[in-house]
Amino acid sequence: MSTIVVVRKGEQAALAADTLTSWGTQRESAAYIANHEKTLAVGAGFVAFCGPSSAGHMLKNYFGSLKNPPKFSSPDDIFATWIMLHAACKDRYYLNPNEDDSDSVESTRFNVLIASPSGIFGVGSHRLVQEFTRFYAYGSGAEYALGALWALYDDPKLTAEALAIKAVAAAAEFNSATGLPVNCHTVRLK
């Protein structure tokens, strides 16, 4: 799987992701895979994903096809974007939205974190959009990343970027589906 992290501190937001791809017990590190990034620039912000590797292609193709990139300005704005993205995933990219018969709505089958000038956000696979005040993480190493963020966040010497990198590194240390190096991007908050 993956570990993705978003952090807000001061006037900076940071989004970080590991670079390991894994298929069962097979691990493919950034040393062997040229297109290993799990992050992409969208408008004035950045998006990171965890889930199937094809999610990166879907996101890049979908956002690249828009005349105007989304602003990612609020949970409602992001939800409206994700409704259209989900339809495109099914129609253009042949997404199989069936995860579990007990689900009340179809799944997009990947989770996303967003850093934009308006703040930091998460979108779950069932399109629940949350705005975070400090930090969050998704993926197989999320519990390690969240623990590191909780322990380090109040250190005045650490920026949002430093925290995000340390959180993914902590996940890589303890989670077999998370690997270094870390890709990290920052955004200046409004």
Describe each PLM feature range:
Residues 114:
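N-terminal glycine-/lysine-enriched basic segments
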Residues 111:
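Adenine-nucleotide phosphate-binding core of ATP-dependent small-molecule kinases
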Residues 1-100, 105, 129-161, 178-188:
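Conserved short S/T/G-enriched processing/targeting/catalytic segments and their helical context
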Residues 173, 187-190:
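Oxyanion-binding and handling regions
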Residues 161-169:
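Small-residue (G/A/S/T)-rich helix-start motifs and N-terminal tracts that mark the onset
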